[in-house]
Amino acid sequence: FILNTHHHFDHVGGNAELKKKYSSKILGFEKDKNRIPSIDVLLKDDQEFRIGNLNFRTIFIPGHTLGHIAFYLEKEKIVFTGDTLFSLGCGRIFEGTYQQMFDSLNKIKSLPGDTEIYCGHEYTNNNLEFCLKFNPNNNYLKEKEKIIKAKIKEKKPTIPTTIKEEIQTNIFLRYDDLDVKSTLNLKNA
């Protein structure tokens, strides 16, 4: 099985070749049926499905694209967020609106804190620098910086992260934090 979070080529470009080589089924959101190559299974929002002994649930999270979904495994406490939420960042808005992205980030933010996040790209170090610029007094972020730098030095991945860590450190989930608002001159927003 190949699960597609959205239609961008860097995520679906190998679908046909992988499908042919491994006789895989391609799964994706129904709204992207004409944009995900070789799609076999059209998924709906909040749809549950099973692969082997794993139970998945889709979460519709538009913003980065209009047909973006996440794959959530509640029992395993794992979510695949594609390009909507990254470690210490979020994806660019290509097709959706800022309100859609805001709502989608809040959907992800509402998952249990110990849920592991597997995102579509490894931008952690760049995102760290960005977050430190706008949230320099965040002690959780300073601690996470040490962990990230150590992992990079040891050539280890910085993914996964968790919902709890992202709520504490990711400025895109800390929009209501007074320190972040102050740095952005948005105290009254």
Feature roles, as predicted:
Residues K19-K21, T97-Y98, N135-P136:
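Glycine-rich, phosphate-binding/catalytic loops in enzymes
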Residues I36-L132:
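Catalytic core of the metallo-beta-lactamase
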Residues V12-N15, I39, D45-D46, G52, ...:
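Surface-exposed loop/turn and secondary-structure junction residues enriched for glycine/proline
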Residues F1-T58, I147:
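Active-site HxH/HxHxD metal-binding segment of metal-dependent hydrolases
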Residues N4, K31, G120, T124, ...:
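Proline- and acidic/polar-enriched loop/turn elements at helix boundaries
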